[in-house]
Design a protein with these regions (language model features):
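N-terminal glycine-rich anion-binding loops that anchor highly charged ligand groups
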Residues: 51-55, 88-95
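Structural motif
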Residues: 56-59, 81, 94-98, 143-146
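N-terminal amphipathic/basic leader segments beginning at the initiator methionine
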Residues: 11-72
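Short, Lys/Arg-enriched N-terminal segments with co-localized hydrophobic residues
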Residues: 1-10
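Short glycine-rich or small-residue beta-strand-to-loop segments that form or flank ligand, phosphate
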Residues: 95-108, 146-153
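Glycine-rich, mobile lid/loop segments that gate access to catalytic sites or pores
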Residues: 120, 124-128, 139-207
């Protein structure tokens, strides 16, 4: 079996992203080809987290579950999504939700509670998708969802905007990827970067 390691460090895709003077030199042809990865679906939407409309919310959905490993900062001051992720003990995850514009850091109990609410909504909707798409559907639990948050520190976490965008994220999930879709996901998590950053590595594990 082949495992894929994909590094996405960016976030925002509308055609205007490529017209923006700061990133006008970025061309999709400049990036390596990125292959389809079985078992992965992804989608991006605008949750209106920025004044200028852009993709700012990305969902990775692992229909069969994904084994994962985490490396966390050693700092004692961490964001609420890291507190959530460190408590996840499931062997597999089924969803990874990433937002930009807000780091969910120094947001206190409200920031953590927001993730708890989102995980309940997202796990329920992904369970419904399992029922629609799979022969042997699984009930996905809130503790099988991980969060990535990046952006401004100390601002109230935009719970309402993100929750209201989840149905659209689910509807837009695509099981087949190509370079454009990976680019869109990378641009959906971009904060201060001027260009999207994408890379892929394939490795064989075991005999």
């Amino acid at each position: 079996y082949s495992n894929y390691l994909i590094n996405l460090n960016i976030m925002d895709f509308n055609i205007s992203n490529f017209i923006d003077i700061r990133s006008k030199k970025s061309k999709i042809g400049d990036f390596q080809d990125l292959d389809h990865v079985d078992g992965v679906a992804l989608s991006t939407v605008s949750a209106n987290l920025y004044k200028e409309k852009r993709d700012d919310l990305v969902l990775f959905y692992f229909r069969d579950g994904a084994s994962y490993a985490s490396v966390f900062t050693q700092s004692k001051i961490i964001s609420e999504n890291l507190k959530w992720n460190k408590k996840i003990k499931s062997k597999k995850i089924y969803g990874l939700l990433i937002n930009t514009r807000n780091a969910n850091a120094l947001t206190g109990a409200d920031g953590y509670k927001a993730l708890k609410q989102i995980s309940k909504d997202l796990s329920k909707m992904l369970s419904n998708k399992q029922n629609d798409d799979e022969e042997s559907p699984k009930e996905i639990k809130p503790n099988e969802i991980l969060f990535g948050c990046t952006g401004t520190i100390g601002e109230k976490f935009p719970l309402t905007q993100i929750k209201s965008s989840i149905p659209n994220l689910i509807d837009r999930l695509k099981y087949t990827q190509n370079k454009l879709i990976w680019m869109k996901a990378a641009m959906g998590i971009k904060t201060t970067d001027l260009k999207p950053k994408l890379s892929m590595c394939e490795a064989k594990i075991g005999s």
